[in-house]
């Protein structure tokens, strides 16, 4: 639905989506590859040195002459005055002209500032290409849903391991290490992050892990962010260690009620503001405004990126609702602080939107508060 004739992509997720190519995960934040899709032509990929020859030999869905070596700025480590940005901006502009797209906008997802300037100096009308790509990636096909389901199944297994290992004497970082090991052994291509939060660290939510020792009676929650064949998980579970207090259990029950209420709302045609409405306000949880509570009661698309569309939050959805559609895959997450002032419960479910509702694909049991190594 865009009016762009060309897409120039530096985001590794967009490059993968358009060209079906990927090199090592180390590339993610380097801005060392780029891809051009112009008119009806097949994609061009400028790769990191010899990776171009590798893709030429092994990526038979690409035109061999479109597998090129090239680099621009690598996040500024190659200064603009070296001239590489101008060199490739000229090459890109010529390819766009050859494809008959010179008079149409060029969607760029993101690039270094100097690269934007170089493209504009070549007379290109640069527009926001990230919105075009995110719209294209909103609806998942059958293969994508299968990969997302497989990724979630891997995390099911990790949570069973955590349920067995979570006991006094083990540290948050030990759980992170064990989880990384298990995921890579199962075939994960990237463990993006694992949050491990326990005891007094549960409130406020710090979004990290430390070397804190687990103690009897701790409430602890974890988030596992990893990908299988590029497709990602965001999947929280809360446990108690040995036993739970009434305050901790009450927090869990509320978090479960909130997430169940949001899952019940999911079906094609429902707008995201209606989902966000069933969650508590920031003020009811002790925050001054929704910005301070952002991400605690939250929904976000899953795919090649951790955060895709739709985004569901009281901070944005009430004024800017989006329509839920069949084929979307997203995570719903809730958070409830306990009345003891430091414990908290966090639950997250991944759902696939079907023609009549949704299917939950995060299957480690979470209907009731799991007690690990019960006394």
Model-assigned labels for residue ranges:
Residues 1-375:
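Active-site neighborhoods and metal-handling regions in enzymes and metal-associated proteins
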């Amino acid at each position: 639905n865009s009016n762009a004739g060309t897409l120039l992509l530096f985001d590794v997720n967009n490059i993968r989506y358009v060209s079906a190519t990927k090199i090592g995960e180390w590339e993610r934040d380097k801005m060392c590859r780029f891809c051009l899709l112009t008119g009806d032509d097949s994609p061009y990929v400028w790769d990191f040195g010899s990776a171009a020859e590798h893709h030429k030999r092994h990526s038979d869905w690409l035109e061999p002459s479109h597998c090129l070596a090239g680099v621009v700025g690598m996040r500024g480590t190659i200064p603009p005055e070296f001239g590489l940005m101008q060199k490739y901006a000229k090459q890109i502009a010529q390819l766009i002209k050859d494809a008959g797209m010179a008079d149409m906008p060029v969607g760029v997802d993101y690039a270094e500032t100097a690269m934007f300037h170089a493209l504009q100096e070549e007379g290109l009308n640069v527009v926001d290409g990230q919105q075009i790509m995110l719209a294209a990636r909103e609806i998942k096909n059958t293969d994508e849903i299968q990969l997302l389901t497989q990724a979630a199944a891997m995390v099911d297994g990790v949570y069973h391991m955590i349920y067995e290992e979570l006991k006094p004497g083990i540290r948050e970082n030990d759980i992170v290490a064990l989880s990384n090991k298990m995921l890579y052994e199962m075939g994960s291509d990237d463990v993006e992050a694992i949050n491990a939060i326990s005891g007094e660290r549960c409130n406020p939510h710090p979004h990290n892990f430390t070397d804190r020792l687990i103690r009897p009676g701790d409430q602890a929650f974890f988030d596992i962010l990893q990908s299988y064949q590029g497709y990602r998980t965001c999947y929280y579970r809360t446990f108690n260690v040995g036993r739970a207090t009434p305050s901790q259990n009450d927090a869990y029950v509320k978090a479960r009620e909130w997430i169940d209420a949001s899952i019940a709302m999911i079906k094609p045609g429902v707008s995201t503001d209606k989902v966000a409405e069933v969650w508590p306000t920031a003020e009811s949880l002790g925050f001054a405004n929704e910005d301070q509570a952002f991400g605690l009661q939250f929904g976000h698309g899953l795919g090649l990126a951790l955060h895709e569309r739709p985004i569901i939050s009281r901070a944005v959805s009430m004024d800017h609702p989006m329509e839920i559609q069949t084929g979307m895959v997203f995570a719903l997450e809730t958070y409830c602080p306990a009345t003891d002032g430091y414990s908290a419960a966090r639950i997250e479910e991944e759902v696939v939107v079907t023609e009549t509702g949704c299917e939950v694909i995060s299957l480690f049991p979470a209907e009731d508060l799991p007690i690990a190594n019960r006394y």
